[in-house]
Amino acid sequence: MIKATDRKLVVGLEIGTAKVAALVGEVLPDGMVNIIGVGSCPSRGMDKGGVNDLESVVKCVQRAIDQAELMADCQISSVYLALSGKHISCQNEIGMVPISEEEVTQEDVENVVHTAKSVRVRDEHRVLHVIPQEYAIDYQEGIKNPVGLSGVRMQAKVHLITCHNDMAKNIVKAVERCGLKVDQLIFAGLASSYSVLTEDERELGVCVVDIGGGTMDIAVYTGGALRHTKVIPYAGNVVTSDIAYAFGTPPSDAEAIKVRHGCALGSIVGKDESVEVPSVGGRPPRSLQRQTLAEVIEPRYTELLNLVNEEILQLQEKLRQQGVKHHLAAGIVLTGGAAQIEGLAACAQRVFHTQVRIGAPLNITGLTDYAQEPYYSTAVGLLHYGKESHLNGEAEVEKRVTASVGSWIKRLNSWLRKEF
């Protein structure tokens, strides 16, 4: 058995309200992620992204990790962990520093980003991510990479994502109870955007919505930069609950009916299609028209998507007032387990009045039969995030080695000049 650290392996772990998913990916030389292990099990002990039964969560995590290890034939020691919940919040901040030399160095960039993130965040919150949006040097704005440019003062605009300390501690505790280390906590909506969006979509303006069981995670990009993140604490489980109450069926059966026979647009359902609905209390099952089922599902999905639309409209108005690109020319990308229902893209187009697609994970090879579903978007995004961290880490080591060799040569040259 190979240890996950012996090869360029990254492990993504998503502990959602509906499922726990673990993916093992190998980083290939061309930057692709080759998925070699998958583990998944229904989630217990989670509600809307928060832990409400630690022992149950630990058991679920252990089961998913065991499956992934068995399939990948490796020993997992650490994971990139997704985090969601209504305690996640965001803010856009600005930092400014004088440029130390004539040209901007990497150190200047790090300093200005550090200045931008050194702001007061909400009480009992910690910073999860600091994501640069763009830079300005003196009077030149909209710079993507300032290194090497000349100027006197540099400004950075950044997007901060924060989370509640205790919520983060609880989910990390569940993972550590399984003998695993958390490499990094990543906002689930950000991970999903790494997984399903293209560079063109980010540039044109796009909103990705990951619809899970307990939460909808939103990330909005315009001009290639992340402008807004949000968690709405209502999602697929609300639809399941509606089905259970409307037809008097157990929640587990309601979930199965939603997944197998659900449709978010009644007009595309055939009139003679029927569904068998289990009853409670030992009563015999009943037959139900699929059209009737769609009449319960469609209004609830429309309501959920309207919550997202309200968020987008408020953001666009704010960006417009700030003079920032606010059009979402690439439309909406829906992903996550609850985005797999039939008719959702057409239902969403009626709400958003723009193009909508269902997003599945991109740029992966290997066990794609398992992982190339919207269901795994967050977990695949964690692998992409981990891959970037791996590559950046290696680049930093190379940079430090080059710098130390360079300084050694400089010292040698100055000594030679002094001596001879």
From Swiss-Prot:
<comment type="similarity">
    <text>Belongs to the FtsA/MreB family.</text>
</comment>
<dbReference type="InterPro" id="IPR020823">
    <property type="entry name" value="Cell_div_FtsA"/>
</dbReference>
<dbReference type="GO" id="GO:0009898">
    <property type="term" value="C:cytoplasmic side of plasma membrane"/>
</dbReference>
<dbReference type="GO" id="GO:0043093">
    <property type="term" value="P:FtsZ-dependent cytokinesis"/>
</dbReference>
<keyword id="KW-0132">Cell division</keyword>
<dbReference type="GO" id="GO:0005829">
    <property type="term" value="C:cytosol"/>
</dbReference>
<dbReference type="InterPro" id="IPR050696">
    <property type="entry name" value="FtsA/MreB"/>
</dbReference>
<comment type="subunit">
    <text>Self-interacts. Interacts with FtsZ. This interaction plays an essential role in cell division. Interacts directly with the cytoplasmic region of FtsN.</text>
</comment>
<dbReference type="GO" id="GO:0005886">
    <property type="term" value="C:plasma membrane"/>
</dbReference>
<dbReference type="GO" id="GO:0032153">
    <property type="term" value="C:cell division site"/>
</dbReference>
<dbReference type="InterPro" id="IPR043129">
    <property type="entry name" value="ATPase_NBD"/>
</dbReference>
<dbReference type="Pfam" id="PF14450">
    <property type="entry name" value="FtsA"/>
</dbReference>
<comment type="function">
    <text>Essential cell division protein that assists in the assembly of the Z ring. May serve as the principal membrane anchor for the Z ring. Also required for the recruitment to the septal ring of the downstream cell division proteins FtsK, FtsQ, FtsL, FtsI and FtsN. Binds ATP.</text>
</comment>
<dbReference type="InterPro" id="IPR003494">
    <property type="entry name" value="SHS2_FtsA"/>
</dbReference>
<dbReference type="GO" id="GO:0051301">
    <property type="term" value="P:cell division"/>
</dbReference>
<dbReference type="GO" id="GO:0042802">
    <property type="term" value="F:identical protein binding"/>
</dbReference>
<dbReference type="GO" id="GO:1990586">
    <property type="term" value="C:divisome complex"/>
</dbReference>
<keyword id="KW-0997">Cell inner membrane</keyword>
<dbReference type="GO" id="GO:0005524">
    <property type="term" value="F:ATP binding"/>
</dbReference>
<protein>
    <recommendedName>
        <fullName>Cell division protein FtsA</fullName>
    </recommendedName>
</protein>
<keyword id="KW-0472">Membrane</keyword>
<keyword id="KW-1003">Cell membrane</keyword>
<dbReference type="GO" id="GO:0000917">
    <property type="term" value="P:division septum assembly"/>
</dbReference>
<keyword id="KW-0131">Cell cycle</keyword>
<dbReference type="Pfam" id="PF02491">
    <property type="entry name" value="SHS2_FTSA"/>
</dbReference>
